[in-house]
Amino acid sequence: MAKTNGFMGHDMLAPFTAAWMIDMGPLVIDKAEGSYVYGVNGKKYLDSLSGLWCTVLGGSEPRLIEAASKQLNKSAFYHSFWNRTTKPSLDLAKELINMFTANKMGKVFFTSSGSEANDTQVKLVWYYNNAIGRPNKKKIISRKNAYHGSTYMTAGLSGLPSLHLKFDLPPPYILHTDCPHYWNYHLPGETEEEYSTRLANNLENLILKEGPETVAAFIAEPVMGGAGVIIPPATYFEKIQAVLKKYDILFIADEVICGFGRLGTMFGCDKYNIKPDLVSIAKALSGGYIPIGAVLVSEEISKVIMSQSNQLGVFCHGFTYSGHPVACAVALEALKIYKEKNITEVVNKLSPKLQEGLKAFIDSPIIGEIRGTGLVLSTEFVDNKSPNDPFPPEWGVGTYFGSQCQKHGMLVSFSGDHVNMAPPFTLSLEELDEMISIYGKALKDTEKRVEELKSQKK
């Protein structure tokens, strides 16, 4: 259908898309209703990833649409430069300060995306250390397999080789420590807590090797999303935070995916007792209806930044759309809905059925691990149920599973041989049953495909 609608070989340079996909023609989405999206091909798809982890209230929440329309009719745009701003941006900043309770925050800086938020974090960390007389404390430690965005800085922070390849990344001041994927990387007989201890020791050794006086911050998602929903092993963040505190290294919590209920708590920091100095949010902040992100800055860092800006005459960082009034109005309405619906309770009621329903497929011979919490889950396909036996990349097992899901009427995210699902919080029990059913059908198709490929290999 894409061809007949004139979209084959289209003119858009599409993100995270190979040229051969463009030549085939894209799946073009025409409209959204609740948990479903509809293509111009007339087909209906259950959206099991909430767009890109963001449309948590479904695709047709009238209150968010009304909030945007009302603000557009009142004031479509005004900036927040030079001590000028709009009421929605001030109201949203106050609401976020009150809402985030894992640590006391002092200020909110608005962006248009999670990438911009994480990019801003690095500048704030450098600005802060310069202000307090630590000009050499600039290195940022991230984790292997992490995803923190795709700007120059945040692609460097990301620990995925594909984001670095041919982009001359990462820069030398960005370092990467272990990915905390217990199933994949633990030693024989090693418990989760022992694994966490080893990773914390490795982090400390990296800091000592680089020189603690040169390491400024550590960035982490509470649960790693793009890496394939990596759940932190027992005591991991407790041990990591102890190392950071020992060497006076700031903690940046990337809550872009985890924030606003996805894990069954309002923020991932609440679930894992993380006390961050800086926090990045986006995606569900507006329910995905309009681009907006934000940086939450601790009281201590806020005071230093404000003092430094007075000395310099200006805090010289910002974007045209920082605190866009329409985006802020939509975000305010989204936060109201989360409170009214007690969204974490909604997630915790749906979570057991999603987790148990999909984890029931763990005995499949092509599945190594199904991992998840709250309303987020990932399936990792391997041979012999072992992380040491991946399928040949050219087999495209994860891609094939994703294509079969689409054929049966459901959209998932796939990267390599892991497949992610993070459905809207508005999902009905019937829709959840449909999701599990389609997953099972696609899995059978994929098992058959793997058997065919194995027989051809003999």
Curated annotation (Swiss-Prot):
PROSITE patterns: AA_TRANSFER_CLASS_3. It catalyses: 4-aminobutanoate + pyruvate = succinate semialdehyde + L-alanine; 4-aminobutanoate + glyoxylate = succinate semialdehyde + glycine. Pyridoxal 5'-phosphate binds at G114, S115, D254. Expressed in leaves, roots, stems, flowers and fruits. Expressed in carpels, but not in stamens. InterPro entries: Aminotrans_3, Aminotrans_3_PPA_site, PyrdxlP-dep_Trfase, PyrdxlP-dep_Trfase_major, PyrdxlP-dep_Trfase_small. Keywords: Aminotransferase, Cytoplasm, Pyridoxal phosphate, Transferase. Its main location: cytoplasm. One of its GO terms (molecular function) is pyridoxal phosphate binding. Substrate binds at Y147, K283. The modification N6-(pyridoxal phosphate)lysine is found at K283. It is found in: Cytoplasm. Pfam families: Aminotran_3 (PF00202). The keyword Transferase applies. Gene3D superfamilies: Aspartate Aminotransferase, domain 1, Type I PLP-dependent aspartate aminotransferase-like (Major domain). Its EC number is 2.6.1.96. One of its GO terms (cellular component) is cytoplasm. One of its GO terms (biological process) is biotin biosynthetic process. Transaminase that degrades gamma-amino butyric acid (GABA) and uses pyruvate or glyoxylate as amino-group acceptor. Cannot use beta-alanine, ornithine, acetylornithine, serine, glycine, asparagine, glutamine, glutamate, valine, leucine, isoleucine, methionine, phenylalanine, histidine, lysine, arginine, aspartate, threonine, tyrosine, tryptophan, proline, or cysteine as amino donors. May be responsible for establishing the GABA gradient in the carpel. Belongs to the class-III pyridoxal-phosphate-dependent aminotransferase family. NCBIfam families: PRK06105.1. This is Gamma aminobutyrate transaminase 2. It comes from Solanum lycopersicum (Tomato).
